[in-house]
């Protein structure tokens, strides 16, 4: 469950290490984001000389949340951390690698490129 001011780890190789959620996209009253939701964020920590710099405003899709997510079959999925992947306006990832597992909900939201790059889909 991601909301404004939530900090997330970046799970790709764009050079950003940590981002801070500015806005959850999807309507004016939308308060929380879960796996597969798109957020607007700012880069809080980045590797020097990388593609993104500290202070850049980016779009990202949430790939892992510490808050459990209920699946249609009644099972629950949760991760140890909150993590996101920085994306372009078209929905494709800006990086070329994804680190760590991602949720199966990304397939339902049509983020196929992220699914194909991920080492594990849970």
Swiss-Prot record:
Biological process terms in GO annotation = translation
Known CDD domains for this protein? Ribosomal_uL14
One GO cellular component term of this record is: cytosolic large ribosomal subunit
Q: Which domain of life is it from?
A: Bacteria
Q: What does the UniProt keyword field contain?
A: Ribonucleoprotein, Ribosomal protein, RNA-binding, rRNA-binding
Pfam families xref list: Ribosomal_L14 (PF00238)
* Molecular functions (GO terms): large ribosomal subunit rRNA binding; structural constituent of ribosome
Matches recorded under SMART domains? Ribosomal_L14
Subunit composition and interactions: Part of the 50S ribosomal subunit. Forms a cluster with proteins L3 and L19. In the 70S ribosome, L14 and L19 interact and together make contacts with the 16S rRNA in bridges B5 and B8.
Relate the protein's function as given in its record. Binds to 23S rRNA. Forms part of two intersubunit bridges in the 70S ribosome.
NCBIfam families (alphabetical):
rplN_bact
Stated name of the protein = Large ribosomal subunit protein uL14
Q: Which organism is it from?
A: Salinispora tropica (strain ATCC BAA-916 / DSM 44818 / JCM 13857 / NBRC 105044 / CNB-440)
């Amino acid at each position: 469950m991601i909301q404004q001011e939530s900090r997330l780890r970046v799970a790709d190789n764009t050079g950003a290490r940590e981002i801070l959620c500015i806005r959850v996209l999807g309507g004016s009253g939308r308060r929380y984001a879960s796996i597969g939701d798109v957020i607007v964020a700012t880069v809080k920590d980045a590797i020097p000389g990388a593609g993104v710099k500290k202070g850049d405003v980016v779009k990202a899709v949430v790939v892992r949340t510490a808050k459990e997510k209920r699946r249609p079959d009644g099972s629950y999925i949760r991760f140890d951390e909150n993590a996101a992947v920085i994306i372009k306006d078209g929905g494709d990832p800006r990086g070329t690698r994804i680190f760590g597992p991602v949720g199966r909900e990304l397939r339902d939201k049509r983020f196929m490129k992220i699914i194909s790059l991920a080492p594990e889909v849970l």
